[in-house]
Amino acid sequence: ACSRAGENCYKSGRCCDGLYCKAYVVTCYKP
């Protein structure tokens, strides 16, 4: 499973395609 935009990515450690996870924000975002 992957995290979508705005979702927490700290636990999963991965975001859906095209999204990135900022370590200090811990949410997926579009570049």
UniProtKB/Swiss-Prot annotation:
Record-level GO cellular component terms: extracellular region
Any S-S bridges, and between which cysteines?
Answer: C2-C16, C9-C21, C15-C28
- State which residue ranges cross the membrane: none
What is the superkingdom listed in this entry's lineage?
Eukaryota
User: What GO annotations for molecular function exist for this entry?
Assistant: toxin activity
Query: Where in the body, by tissue, does this protein show up?
Result: Expressed by the venom gland.
Q: Does the keyword Signal apply?
A: no
Role, per record: Insecticidal toxin that induces reversible paralysis in crickets but not in cockroaches and mice. Molecular target unknown.
**What is the protein name given in its UniProt record?**
U1-theraphotoxin-Cv1a
